[in-house]
Amino acid sequence: MNTNSTTVASSFLNDLKTQTADSHKKLEELPVSMSIMSPDMKIEEYAKYLNLMHDVHADTEETVFPLFSGLLDDLEQRRKKQLIEADLSYLNCDVTSFEKVFKTENISIPFALGILYVVEGSTLGGRFILKNVSKVPQLSGDKGVSYFNGYGDKTGSFWKSFLNFLSEYEQQNNCGDAIIEGAVFAFDSIYNHFESR
C-alpha cells in the first residue's frame, strides 16, 4: 500500500469508527452488556451473555461467512460458535434455542463486511472482558473462557489482518457507505437481540 492508499484507508476506518460510535455505546450500556464487566458478575449472567453471543455468531457463520468463502483466507479460523458451546458445556449450561439476529435479506458483500467488522471487533473487546471474568473462581485458568480468549496472543494480529482486508476491499470497490451501513445495522441488531431476551 502506498502512502496515499494508507491515508485513504485510515480515513475510511476513522469514519467507520466515528459513524458507529453511538450504536456501539448504546449496546455497551445495556444491563446485560454491563453485567459481564461488573466486579460482582454472576455465572448466570455470564451464561446468559454467552447464549446471546452464541446467536450472534451462529447467525454470522450461517449468513455472513459464506459470502467470504475464497475472499478471506483465515475465515475458518474466525469461527467462534464452538468456543461458546464449549464454555457453556464447561459451566453445565444449555445452549438456548437459536434466534436469528440479523433479520435482513440479500446481504451484499460490503454490507456483510460491516457486520463482520462488529463481530470481529467484539473478539478484540473480549480480551478486555476476559480480565474481568477471569476473576471469578469458577472461570479462572482457561476453563469456561475460551470465547473471550479469542485468538489468544494472536488476537491483535487477527484484528489488524481483518482491518487490512476491509480497507483494501473498500478502496477497490468504493463501498464505504455500505460497509458503514452494515456495521450500524449489526450494532443495532445485536442491541435489539440483547434487549428482547
Kindly give the residue locations of the regions a language model identified:
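Metal- and O2-centered redox machinery and metal/ROS homeostasis
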Residues: 1-197
